[in-house]
Every structure is written in structure tokens, then in C-alpha cells.
């Protein structure tokens, strides 16, 4: 089964694809979808949608795992993140994928063993779980972590 992990953001959405065969997990691909901060919001959302649709079409995942949104002190940032998340959820649904959402603390716990793990700890464990994988950046690393979290939870 191919799982698409997603870490939504308006500026840089991370994506990661893993293959699960029994208890074995292997890396397929990962990347980041960046939008132009100077572009109008609708144009940025269209770019995110188009790029995500291409990833889904190219790799034909069976399901998607998306990191849940967190609310911060800046309402504008939270709204922008919510817009991007909506596009990601819609794109996955349009692509025929079942979508499961995971809280960031649960993802960290699934990868490192503690929900309070730092990003560096998550990235280090990804190197152990997916040896030899070149990760496109921190957002792609988070997306791979979400995909692995889903792989672990669907076995239960």
C-alpha cells in the first residue's frame, strides 16, 4: 500500500510517499510544494492544488495522512494555514484517497516515542526508519513522519 503523508502550509506544503508491505516500510518519494508569497491568495491555492494533484496522479497512493492544524496567536497565520489545509483535504478527496488526520504530538510519539520531541529528533529517526533517504526539507520530513505514523496506526 502506498501512503501519502502531508504537512500543509500556504508557503511550503511538505509531502512524502511510503510503501507499506507487511511490517516493512520503504521510501518512494518526497518533496515540498512552495508558493510565491507575493502572489494573490487564490493563485497560491491554485498552485498548491495543481501540484498536489500531480503528486497524486504520478504515484497513485491508496490513502493520505494529514497533520492536523494548530491554532497560534496570529489569527492571520491560522487562517492561511486553514486555507491550505482545505485545499489539501479537497485534493485528496478529489483524488479518491481516504484521509486520516493526526495531531503533531501523536506523530512525534509514533516516530520518536515522545510527543514533545524536537524537529531534529524526528528527522534523525527518519534516517533510521528510512535509511538512505534524501529528504527535500523540514516540511517533507514532517510529511514522511505523518505517513509513517499512519502506517503504524493502521496496523493496530
Swiss-Prot record:
GO cellular component, one term: Holliday junction resolvase complex
InterPro entries xref list: RNaseH-like_sf, RNaseH_sf, X-over_junc_endoDNase_Mg_BS, X-over_junc_endoDNase_RuvC
Binding site for Mg(2+) 1: 7, 139
Keywords on record: Cytoplasm, DNA damage, DNA recombination, DNA repair, DNA-binding, Endonuclease, Hydrolase, Magnesium, Metal-binding, Nuclease
Catalytic activity: Endonucleolytic cleavage at a junction such as a reciprocal single-stranded crossover between two homologous DNA duplexes (Holliday junction)
Location, primary (coarse class): cytoplasm
Record's subunit section: Homodimer which binds Holliday junction (HJ) DNA. The HJ becomes 2-fold symmetrical on binding to RuvC with unstacked arms; it has a different conformation from HJ DNA in complex with RuvA. In the full resolvosome a probable DNA-RuvA(4)-RuvB(12)-RuvC(2) complex forms which resolves the HJ.
Protein name from the UniProt record: Crossover junction endodeoxyribonuclease RuvC
Source organism of this protein record: Sphingopyxis alaskensis (strain DSM 13593 / LMG 18877 / RB2256) (Sphingomonas alaskensis)
Gene: ruvC
Amino acid at each position: 500500500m502506498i501512503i501519502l503523508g502531508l504537512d500543509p502550509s500556504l508557503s511550503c506544503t511538505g509531502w512524502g510517499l511510503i510503501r507499506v508491505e507487511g511490517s516493512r516500510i520503504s521510501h518512494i518519494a518526497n518533496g515540498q510544494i512552495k508558493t510565491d508569497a507575493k502572489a494573490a491568495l487564490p493563485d497560491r491555492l491554485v498552485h498548491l492544488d495543481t501540484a498536489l494533484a500531480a503528486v497524486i496522479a504520478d504515484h497513485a497512493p491508496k490513502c493520505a495522512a494529514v497533520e492536523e492544524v494548530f491554532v497560534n496567536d496570529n489569527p492571520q497565520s491560522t487562517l492561511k494555514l486553514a486555507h491550505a489545509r482545505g485545499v489539501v483535504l479537497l485534493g485528496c478527496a478529489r483524488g479518491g484517497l481516504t484521509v486520516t488526520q493526526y495531531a503533531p504530538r501523536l506523530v512525534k510519539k509514533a516516530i520518536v516515542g515522545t510527543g514533545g520531541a524536537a524537529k531534529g529528533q524526528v528527522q534523525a529517526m527518519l534516517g533510521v526508519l528510512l535509511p538512505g533517504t534524501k529528504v527535500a526539507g523540514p516540511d517533507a520530513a514532517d510529511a514522511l513522519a505523518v505517513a509513517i505514523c499512519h502506517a503504524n496506526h493502521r496496523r493496530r
